[in-house]
């Protein structure tokens, strides 16, 4: 039987995506076995993340500054806005270095099954950014899932009255695929072949 501290750590790790109780227990045992090489650096990294990272009030990205480095970068094309579901999607697209504009993170996607409604996402903030003017194109970069496409259609309907070009990523993306898991070549092709939302 393990100590309460080990059980607490195991339960905390098991809440992370992709880790169940058995994987979490193996991770805890590894950290304890390699205490100086693994546990110390992990603790320092977690502390730094907790102390220094914040959510950008403009786009929802996670960074050390607010506004984030992308929103504050004058080299970014402020006329282009790419809307993504999660921060991981923003990072995946930004790694491709093909999108010259700025981003907007919704914080999820619409889902009747999970009870996620439009007011649960940062859609109103997105509408406000577009209503403020200066944006010529909005790229809807939702995942190719039912919920992702439902979210894209909802946003397209909300943006219908705005004078912006509305495009979405080409569907060379696999149906059911998530942006964070795609290679940069696939993402690059999807960005290049984006098309108007109909």
Curated annotation (Swiss-Prot):
Residues 79-174 form the Toprim domain. GO terms for biological process: DNA recombination; DNA repair. Disulfide bonds: none annotated. It comes from Rhizorhabdus wittichii (strain DSM 6014 / CCUG 31198 / JCM 15750 / NBRC 105917 / EY 4224 / RW1). A zinc finger (C4-type) spans 56-71. This is Recombination protein RecR. May play a role in DNA repair. It seems to be involved in an RecBC-independent recombinational process of DNA repair. It may act with RecF and RecO. Keywords: DNA damage, DNA recombination, DNA repair, Metal-binding, Zinc, Zinc-finger. The keyword Metal-binding applies. One of its GO terms (molecular function) is DNA binding. InterPro entries: DNA_Rcmb_RecR (IPR000093), Rcmb_RecR (IPR023627), Rcmb_RecR_Znf (IPR015967), TOPRIM_dom (IPR006171), TOPRIM_RecR (IPR034137). PANTHER family: RECOMBINATION PROTEIN RECR. Belongs to the RecR family. It comes from the Bacteria.
């Amino acid at each position: 039987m393990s100590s309460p501290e080990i059980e607490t750590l195991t339960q905390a790790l098991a809440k992370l995506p992709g880790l169940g109780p058995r994987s979490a227990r193996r991770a805890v045992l590894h950290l304890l076995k390699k205490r100086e090489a693994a546990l110390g650096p992990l603790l320092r990294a977690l502390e730094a993340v907790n102390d220094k990272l914040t959510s950008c009030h403009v786009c929802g990205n996670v960074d050390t500054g607010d506004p984030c480095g992308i929103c504050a970068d004058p080299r970014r094309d402020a006329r282009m806005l790419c809307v993504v579901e999660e921060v991981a999607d923003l990072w995946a697209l930004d790694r491709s270095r093909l999108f010259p504009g700025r981003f907007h993170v919704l914080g999820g996607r619409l889902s009747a099954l999970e009870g996620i409604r439009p007011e649960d996402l940062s859609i109103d903030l997105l509408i406000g950014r577009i209503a403020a003017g200066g944006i010529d194109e909005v790229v809807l970069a939702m995942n190719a899932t039912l919920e992702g496409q439902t979210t894209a259609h909802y946003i397209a309907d909300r943006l219908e009255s705005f004078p912006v070009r509305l495009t979405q990523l080409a569907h060379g993306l696999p149906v059911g695929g998530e942006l964070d898991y795609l290679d940069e070549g696939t993402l690059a092709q999807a960005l290049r072949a984006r098309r108007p939302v109909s």
